[in-house]
Amino acid sequence: MTDRFELVSPYSPAGDQPAAIDKLVANFEAGLAKQTLLGVTGSGKTYTIANVVQQVQKPTLVMAPNKTLAAQLYGEFKSFFPNNAVEYFVSYYDYYQPEAYVPSSDTFIEKDSSINEHIEQMRLSATKTLLSRRDSLVVATVSAIYGLGAPEDYLSLRLILSIGEHIDQRQLIRHLTDLQYTRNEFELTRGAFRVRGEVLDVFPAESDTEALRIELFDGDIEQLTLFDPLTGETLRKLQRYTVYPKTHYATTRERTLSAVDTIKEELKERLEQLYSQNKLVEAQRLAQRTQFDLEMMAEVGFCNGIENYSRHLTGKAPGEPPPTLFDYLPPDALLVIDESHVTIPQIGAMYKGDRSRKETLVEFGFRLPSALDNRPLRFEEWEARSPRSIYVSATPGPYELRESAGEITELVVRPTGLIDPVVEIRPVGTQVDDLMSEVHERIKLGDRVLVTTLTKRMAENLTEYLGEHGIRVRYLHSDIDTVERVEIIRDLRLGKFDVLVGINLLREGLDMPEVSLVAILDADKEGFLRSTGSLIQTIGRAARNLRGKAILYADKMTRSMQAAIDETDRRREKQVEYNLEHGITPKSVARPISDIMEGAREDAAEKKAGKGRSKSRQVAEEPADYRAMGPAEIAGKLKALEQKMYQHAKDLEFEAAAQIRDQIQKLKAASLA
């Protein structure tokens, strides 16, 4: 373990990267608050940021616009910094239905959610790392601006253990229960502890693979040992260990009882208001719901929807922002906003949507007014809490350009020598037939094609039409969840189909080197989906292939089209000059086709494998030759693979399950051959 970032990479900065790294580092060390990295597709933006992190040696928070991109970034930074604390902080809900009331139909919708325990563990690990290590890099989504427990409470509750320290066993057990750990003598699970004589085993909530054994003798801590909770194997002995709370929302008994008193006062004031307005039903509803919650909090220290009382539990004043992940960041940290043209507007939108829903709940007596303070940060609050920042995008928005005040670092030259796609404009009247002939040409070359339309209906019709003409085509739309979307992109890269049709394919920002043609239908319909930024992003999807080409179907040249084409041409010229100067022959990017989400799971899967055991992800590797296996061997292998596939599905690791499913199908085919 080290307190310094150590970048591990087989290659050195090239192209525009050395100058970009030097400029970003110099600006950061000079105290510049905001700067922008304008990096084209395939220019090595992540690698450039990794070099900046290594040089500035500051705790870093990287924000991404969605879980898919966050997982990809987590995997990349994990490979760049294998010896440092790279963490993952996203929403731990697999499914979330917020509490809501629809006055028009008098319908109250109860909160309903499903929490992913593995992601919860990673969130706890992220906050612990930020509080305890300087070499911490956290990849997060917009989840970072939502309320967490106050870091002061989180720190004040922690249990610090040292060898030789005198501690009463009952006191130790009481402290663990204050941290919301549960006693379980039968099975040691995450967030639980067990007592066997003078030995206590604790499975820390933020750990996935290591449990702590506390051995006492006559009231003194004699030994602290980390061990594998699955095998019982001793991993290492320690002089000191800190146990952090099981949840970010843990608080002391005194704070809870104090909150009960202030909630009662607020309830009394609110009921007086409702009675004065003759809102008797609302008053009766609020009194009943709140009094039930108060009884639960007084008796067990918890109630369903306790987050709605967070203002009272944290001691904040009305209207004050809640504590968030940004409160866990040290003041000298570095903030990186990836795909800032998407992430920045997201941050601004979160507060307003949350506010309108909760105002209805308060108005109709389902919640106290203090529930309005359980919210994401407002945009200006987020700005005030943000440390020195770097905005990263191929198409920075007006906010980033304004805030950077001219400090824009360009990353236009690709070390691979790849030039931006050739852009052609063709008439709308024959766009579908022309597209079909282009698709057939690309299929002959073994390449893939992306097609973007303006509407869902048009995408569906085009998919159906292409399918009827024997083209293997799929359609990507907003109703498809993240996991399935990732699988579709993986299948495109694997060649299970050749054409992907969508409405807004630029949002993914994912690497697809097999795509050599991007077709933009109705490119002259000015608007959000055909703005300059959107066009540049979409054209960039073909920038990782040597034969990259973009076709814009349009009958007239719009300002957005002209600006996008001019910018693409400028970048092409700069890359061509660099290639001639350095004698570089462009090559297509060769990126292994793997599970995109594995970045956020691979580390845990490796740890689960434990010392001396094979890595759990190796089940997806294909044996050299199935034909060499006998019938009994094949039957045994099939059974083992099926068990692993179902376990991955149970753990919500759908891409890993899909990989094993493909392997099972190949094994079955081999056994029949």
From Swiss-Prot:
It is found in: Cytoplasm. GO terms for biological process: nucleotide-excision repair; SOS response. GO terms for cellular component: cytoplasm; excinuclease repair complex. Residues 431-597 form the Helicase C-terminal domain. PANTHER family: UVRABC SYSTEM PROTEIN B (PTHR24029:SF0). The UvrABC repair system catalyzes the recognition and processing of DNA lesions. A damage recognition complex composed of 2 UvrA and 2 UvrB subunits scans DNA for abnormalities. Upon binding of the UvrA(2)B(2) complex to a putative damaged site, the DNA wraps around one UvrB monomer. DNA wrap is dependent on ATP binding by UvrB and probably causes local melting of the DNA helix, facilitating insertion of UvrB beta-hairpin between the DNA strands. Then UvrB probes one DNA strand for the presence of a lesion. Forms a heterotetramer with UvrA during the search for lesions. Interacts with UvrC in an incision complex. The gene is uvrB. The keyword Chloroplast does not apply. Residues 635-670 form the UVR domain. GO terms for molecular function: ATP binding; ATP hydrolysis activity; DNA binding; excinuclease ABC activity; helicase activity. ATP binds at G39, V40, T41, G42, S43, G44, K45, T46. Residues 601-628 are annotated as: Disordered. Keywords: ATP-binding, Cytoplasm, DNA damage, DNA excision, DNA repair, Excision nuclease, Helicase, Hydrolase, Nucleotide-binding, SOS response. This is UvrABC system protein B. Belongs to the UvrB family. It comes from the Bacteria. The beta-hairpin motif is involved in DNA binding. InterPro entries: Helicase/UvrB_N, Helicase_ATP-bd, Helicase_C-like, P-loop_NTPase, UVR_dom, UVR_dom_sf, UvrB, UvrB_inter. It comes from Xanthomonas campestris pv. campestris (strain B100). Its main location: cytoplasm. A motif (Beta-hairpin) lies at residues 92-115. The keyword Kinase does not apply. Pfam families: Helicase_C, ResIII, UVR, UvrB, UvrB_inter. Residues 26-183 form the Helicase ATP-binding domain.
